[in-house]
């Protein structure tokens, strides 16, 4: 064991960083690649914001879904069935 400079932070010690970069793979080897991989992949802990998935848009030529929606009867609005009070 080689001596470590006590002024260095623990995460900057030699040998603390893996020689290969982290990947998006979730196999057992990659899950135990480093501490960050273990926490995020093996334990599933992430503190970042979750990205919202964008819906797939239909091609420009297909408007059939919108047409079929307009043919359906409109549902009554929820709320007071007697109407607005004045």
Swiss-Prot record:
Q: What is this protein called?
A: Protein Tat
Q: Which residues carry this modification: N6-acetyllysine?
A: 28, 50-51
Q: Where does it localize? A: Host nucleus, Host nucleolus; Host cytoplasm; Secreted
Which residues are in coiled coils? none
Reply yes or no: does the keyword Metal-binding apply.
yes
The lineage, from the top, is: Viruses, Riboviria, Pararnavirae, Artverviricota, Revtraviricetes
Cross-link Glycyl lysine isopeptide (Lys-Gly) (interchain with G-Cter in ubiquitin): give the residues.
71
List the ranges annotated as motif Nuclear localization signal, RNA-binding (TAR), and protein transduction: 49-57
The yes or no answer to whether the keyword Zinc is present is yes
